[in-house]
A protein has these predicted regions:
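Non-catalytic, topology-defining segments of multipass membrane proteins
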Residues: 1-10, 44-165, 237-280
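Membrane-embedded alpha-helical segments that form the functional core of polytopic membrane enzymes
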Residues: 1-18, 37-51, 172-176, 210-220
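Transmembrane alpha-helical segments that form the membrane-embedded catalytic/substrate-channel core
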Residues: 8-20, 49, 53, 97-101, ...
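Histidine-centered catalytic micro-motifs
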Residues: 16-25, 53-65, 182-189, 219-235
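Aspartate-rich (DDxxD/NDxxD/DxxxD) Mg2+/diphosphate-binding motifs
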Residues: 19-37, 65-76
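Membrane-cytosol interface motif
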Residues: 32, 36-42, 193-207
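C-terminal membrane-associated helical module and adjoining short loops/tails
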Residues: 114-186, 190, 195-196, 200, ...
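Polar-ligand-bearing catalytic/cofactor-coordination segments
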Residues: 190-194, 231, 242, 248-250
Length: 280
């Protein structure tokens, strides 16, 4: 029961992150103040600075797979070999990589492995957004520093143990491989980086048991419609299914990266292709 509880809490924390992602796009609520207040709170609960992520995520959208994309370090280069991703996910589940995840969400420089250049997302934004991000990071730190003391004040030792075991522990273990695998399913092992229709992927969450399980674990709040999200990032998550149907009806997704989840997983877990020798 304890393990099942940890898994379910980690899945729920991922769902909260997806909502904070919508808030980062100003799409959680039309009223911007409410959008940002709730987006900050939702992100804060799982250790994410929504305002910092807003800056970082803009670079991902504007420079997908380009030299300024801070997310390439996460999803780029796949397939990387059968064992590579399993080792990464095992390290995530063991909590070994959580510090890297939260460094990313706090705007730490990301290393582009192709150019060996550090991408500094917080240098490429307005003074106001930079100030908002700085304030938000401070609030996230205060929130998580205060949480165990609040839990103790409310329920003593049992409260602190509940906070640690049923919130902090799944946040640094179960949540981590979910974040990685979902990001790789969205962009890993795509067919053509030059086209917006093939550099991002929509994963079907209908039509088979495997797809439905993927919806529950990896793709809450319609985040599986990632190709459509990259084409039209101003569309809120609850409109993405209708957008997908419209684009399919018009033939706009012919040849696009739209796959069943098992097909995506086969691709990202495939053996690394042989390296081409220069001039060959």
């Amino acid at each position: 029961m304890l393990i099942a509880g940890l898994v379910l809490v980690g899945i729920a924390q991922h769902g909260l992150f997806i909502l904070s992602h919508d808030a980062a796009h100003y799409r959680l609520f039309a009223q911007r103040g409410l959008n940002d207040a709730l987006g900050r709170l939702i992100g804060m609960s799982s250790g994410v600075s929504m305002c910092t992520y807003r800056v970082t995520h803009r670079l991902h959208h504007n420079n997908l797979y380009g030299p300024e994309d801070p997310d390439t370090a996460i999803h780029g280069g796949y397939p990387r070999g059968v064992g590579y991703l399993w080792r990464k996910l095992a390290g995530d589940l063991a909590g070994l990589n959580a510090w890297k995840t939260y460094a990313y969400f706090f705007g730490a420089p990301a290393l582009n492995e192709d150019t060996q250049r550090a991408i500094r997302p917080l240098d490429d934004t307005s003074p106001q957004l930079r100030a908002d991000a700085r304030q938000d990071r401070l609030l996230v730190v205060v929130f998580h520093a205060a949480a165990p003391f609040v839990a103790w004040a409310l329920a003593g030792t049992s409260g602190m143990l509940a906070w640690f075991g049923l919130w902090l522990l799944p946040m640094v273990t179960v949540l981590q491989p979910i974040l990685r695998l979902r990001a790789i399913c969205e962009h890993g092992a795509v067919t053509d980086l030059a086209s917006p229709l093939t550099a991002a992927r929509t994963n079907r969450t209908w039509g088979s048991a495997a797809n439905w399980i993927g919806r529950f674990v990896l793709f809450p709040h319609h985040v599986n419609y990632h190709l459509e999200h990259h084409l039209y990032p101003a569309v809120p998550h609850y409109r993405l299914p209708a957008l997908h149907r419209l684009l399919v009806a018009k033939g706009a997704l012919d040849g696009a990266e739209v796959r069943d989840l098992p097909d995506t997983l086969r691709r990202v877990f495939s053996p690394r292709p042989p390296r081409m020798n220069p001039g060959s």
